[in-house]
């Protein structure tokens, strides 16, 4: 049996982060870190060896989730799935300029989250070096 997929969760709303982390654990994933800012997301993604990063787009502070994802992708081949309640045209364009592994709208629908994670993980495993 494969070990559970390791996830870095990036969410700046504490209650939402706890809820999503709980849902991920119930689905059998291992949440290795919860980041609340872009710089923290980068640090955890590069030091906690996640299989995937679940990234809220709208974060407090100067760096949003798209900028954080760019930094992560420039340093490591880790798939990033974006999460957001609202994405305007400019943000959509910025997302498309990254190698997004998926998008999950808020409020999070658990089957959609699980299916998106599975697609991202299977695609990443087929691309990663052996």
Segment roles from a protein language model:
Residues 81, 87-105, 115:
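Alpha4 helix (beta4-alpha4-beta5 surface) of REC/receiver domains from two-component response regulators
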Residues 37, 63-67:
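Acidic catalytic/metal-coordinating carboxylates
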Residues 13-33:
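Two-component/phosphorelay signaling modules centered on CheY-like receiver
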Residues 21, 34-52:
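Acidic, metal-coordinating helix/loop segments flanking the phosphotransfer/catalytic sites
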